[in-house]
Amino acid sequence: DNDERMGYCQILLERGMEHGMDPADLWFDPLFLVVKGMQDKQMEVLEAIKMFSDMELNSTGGLSNNSNGMPKHIRPIMDSALVAMAMMNGLTSAIVNPCDLRLMETIKSCDIFKNNTLYADSYLEI
């Protein structure tokens, strides 16, 4: 749960800073969970990302874990939906399949809406 996630986050943050690390150099994993069998936990993951973002901490993780075990034609849809929601909650980066065209288009489009990238008609080609 998020109390446990944030407890570990606080411990790691404090230990890193004790050793001279800048919080900006630390990356926290919200632990993306498999939807199959853990559907009720998905919003907690997004809330954890928001908590990291509110603390101005970086977040990253294995995004495609959410769709593990699903049919191949469904995985890109689920991964794209989750990355959009995670980015809007402040996800800094993610471990993703760069060959998944739908996912990459979603990430690039979210970057436009978040004003991380200047829109151009050719933005999908970059």
Question: What is the predicted function of each stretch?
Answer:
Residues D1-D121, I126:
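Catalytic alpha/beta core domains of metabolic enzymes, predominantly
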